[in-house]
Structure formats: C-alpha cells, structure tokens
Amino acid sequence: MYKTVLKNSGRIQRNFIFRNVSSTLQRSLATSASTSSSTTTSNAETGELHVSTPLDSPSVHPPDGSSISLKSATRDASLFGTRPIYLDVQATTPVDPRVLDKMLEFYTGLYGNPHSSTHAYGWETDKEVEKARGYIADVINADPKEIIFTSGATETNNMAIKGVPRFYKKTKKHIITTQTEHKCVLDSARHMQDEGFDITYLPVNSEGLINLDDLKKAIRKDTVLVSVMAVNNEIGVIQPLKEIGQICRENKIFFHTDAAQAYGKIPIDVNEMNIDLLSISSHKIYGPKGIGACYVRRRPRVRLDPIITGGGQERGLRSGTLAPPLVAGFGEAARLMKQESAFDKKHIEKLSTKLKNGLLSIPSTQFNGCNNPTYQYPGCVNVSFAYIEGESLLMALKDIALSSGSACTSASLEPSYVLHALGADDALAHSSIRFGIGRFTTEAEVDYVIQAINERVDFLRKMSPLWEMVQGGIDLNSIEWSGH
C-alpha cells in the first residue's frame, strides 16, 4: 500500500517551480482521487485528502514449479499522487496551469468571433489572437504574419507536403523526404505519389542522421520540396537544419521541417536556417490540444494550394473560424517556452543524464539515438532491453506511463520503422521503450523509474529462455533456428 496526500490549496508547488492553479484543477484532482480504485478519507481541520491505493505484485510459476515474484519499487506517493508517473511527453504534454488560466477568460468574457469586424466583441478577441500569433512567431524569429493557425501538426504537415507541390505541379514533380519521418509526412508523400509525383526517401545512418551528400545527389531540376523532421519523435535525433536549409536555398528548393518535437525546445531561427515552412503543435509545449500552426515564409514567398477552403481566413491558406481559447492558450504556452527555455534545458538535461545512465547500467541494453549531444534532444531517451518484449515491459510498468514508440502508431504490433531505418533488427526494435522528460518531471520520479525498470526487466528476463541461454554462455547467433 502507499499513501498520497493532496493538499487543498490554491497552488501546486514542484521542487523547481511555483505554479498558479485554478479551482478547476483542484476539483479535477479531487475527482480523480475519488474515482480511482482506492480508499479516500479527508481531514476537515488540515484540509488534506488522503488516498490509499494498492500496488499489484504479480507472481508467475515457471514450468519447473518454482515461483518468481516481482517486488515493487517503493513509491513515495506524497510526491507522485495516485496516477502513474508520466514519462510520455513526446506523445503529449500536460497543460501548464498558467496556460489554462489564460484560456479560461475566453470561455466567459472574451467570447467574440475574432473574424467579426463590425463590433467590439470581435475587435477585442482579434487583438488577443494577434498577440498570441506574435508570441508564437517570436520563438522562431518569424514575422507574426507568417504564422498560419491550423488544428495541429498533422494538418500542417499535410498542408506543406500537399499544398506546395500542387501549386507548382506544372513544372516541379519531385519531393525529397526521409525514411524516419512522422507517419503523417510519409502518408502525405505516398498520397502525392498517387498524384504523379516522384518521392525520394533518404536513408539515415545508425544514429538516425541523414547524409548531406545523399541529399545533394537526390536533388533534381524538378525537385520542388525537401521535408526533413527537426527532432525525431521516437528517438530524439536532431537533423542538421541549417546545413539542409543552405543546400535547399542554393538549389531554389522549398524546405519544410516538422518541428512538432523541436519548437521551443531547441534553438530554431527560420531566417538563419533558411526554413520556408515549419510545423508546430501546441500540445507538445504544454498548451491545449486541437491547435497548431504552420510557418509560411513571405520573402521569398512560398505559394501553396490550401487543403481547407471556405471563408478565406488565415491569408486564404486555412479557412475556418479560429478557436480563441485554444489560440490564446497556444500563445501563452509559446511565451512560456521562450521565457523558461534556459531553465527547462538545464532541468531536462540533468534528469536525462541521470535516467540514461541508470537505464544503460542494466546488462544488454542499447541506447537508440545519436551519441553526439549536438544532434540529440535530451528529453527523449529511447532504450532497447534485449531478450524481452517492449509490450511485456510496458504491461509490467502499470505505475509508469510510457510508450514503445510514436503515439500515432503505438497500437500497432509491428516493430518500429524508425529503428529499422537505423539498422536495428526485429528483436531490438520490439524491445524498445521511449522515455520522455519534460518541465514537470521530478528527480524523485526518475529515481523511482530507474529502480522499477531494473526490477521488472530482471523479472521478465528470468522467464525468458533466450536470456537463460545467454547466461549459460550460448551464442545465439551460432544457433541454426528452424521453423515448424
């Protein structure tokens, strides 16, 4: 059993930052605690809510009749609460309480349609929308007029991959991307192939980086667009954006980058890096879901066919009424990303180093990514645990929220195509787990995760015949396996 104390105060205090929290969040915490499989009591004098929740301790019986028991790591619930520890920030981030506070006023007082130009309700909302647009542009040194609001990075990637080639299709019929892009980029590229475009998929090396010479060789006279992800969502590898942008500019080719995992987390200057289009997602930077943006360069101008038409909003590139609460939250999240970038960077690097060292101290583990810190985002740590299935490990880690790859493909049983592109075999690709560290991750949580992973990897390997053979000194590569 472990006990959690949730104080009914107007603030939540982490060991590294003080956050304002609205009463809405307090009620949410209390509701979450009361609906979990736990025992809840309250103390009227101290204003404390006590929640006791059991931890499962699975036990299995191998064929020889012996018993293997999994001893749960000790969890200090006064720090962690009753829900699993969250280490899946590449899938989504929690909304920063200050972002929520900013959004709430747009559900009550500032409810005007920002496109209504005949009265004060529309004017005041439009003013706030433009303020948010400015905050978002400022992070990447762009002009606010170059920010086009969308529903998220998937729509933005579709807009770039489909919109630019369609506009120039009479003279340009070739697109270049990489084998490790997000699914929405790869699927959009395949869609354009069906429309008659040629697609070149650049390979990556064992650390996930493209070869710039491969890019130069792939360029043709009719190449219209190069799309390369800034930070990979599965392994955290940072591509050399400045060098890619320079190559594209010299060849008069448009350069698009999916920066959903990079925006606000690594330095990006669209002018210095010669980026023409850039995809942004709000919910990756502690903002609300359902809102994103596309940076579209104005000088030299980038032309594209819109994929959503109608009222002509957003410079005619993305029609539809904007959602002011989401836009305001997005803008506030962007402002905070720039304001706290130095602190976030230091905090994430510290915890990432600790987590990575702790995980790689386990025998037969492998880090998936780039060992050069210049090309590796520290908040994404992808590790393969040999001789066990990643899905089995996830099931044994019910008290930690993790994933075995992209959230968009996590339901698939197929091994990661990203790790395959790096040259990993099926076994290592199947045994990979992605750990995400963010602004609200604490050192105590990382300590617990390292201890829990050590225990449960050991537990699962004791049931693995392959692990038993390796421990017995058998070289698995020397065995001639036969199928029946």
From Swiss-Prot:
Cofactor: pyridoxal 5'-phosphate
Keyword Iron-sulfur tagged: yes
Major place of residence: mitochondrion
Function: Catalyzes the removal of elemental sulfur from cysteine to produce alanine. It supplies the inorganic sulfur for iron-sulfur (Fe-S) clusters. Plays a role in both tRNA-processing and mitochondrial metabolism. Involved in the 2-thio-modification of both 5-carboxymethylaminomethyl-2-thiouridine in mitochondrial tRNAs and 5-methoxycarbonylmethyl-2-thiouridine (mcm5s2U) in cytoplasmic tRNAs.
Modified residues (N6-(pyridoxal phosphate)lysine): K284
Cellular localisation: Mitochondrion
Keyword tags: Iron, Iron-sulfur, Metal-binding, Mitochondrion, Pyridoxal phosphate, Transferase, Transit peptide, tRNA processing
Binding residues annotated for pyridoxal 5'-phosphate, in chain numbering: A153, T154, N233, Q261, S281, S282, H283, T321
NCBIfam families found in the cross-reference section: PRK02948.1, PRK14012.1
UniProt-annotated stretches for the region Disordered: 29-69
Cross-referenced Pfam families: Aminotran_5
Family per similarity comment: Belongs to the class-V pyridoxal-phosphate-dependent aminotransferase family. NifS/IscS subfamily.
Name of this protein: Cysteine desulfurase, mitochondrial
Organism: Candida maltosa (Yeast)
GO biological process, one term: [2Fe-2S] cluster assembly
Biased segments, Low complexity type: 29-42
Mitochondrion as UniProt keyword: yes
Swiss-Prot/TrEMBL catalytic activity: (sulfur carrier)-H + L-cysteine = (sulfur carrier)-SH + L-alanine
UniProt cross-references to Gene3D superfamilies, sorted A to Z: Aspartate Aminotransferase, domain 1 (3.90.1150.10), Type I PLP-dependent aspartate aminotransferase-like (Major domain) (3.40.640.10)
Effect of T374A: In strain: CHAU1
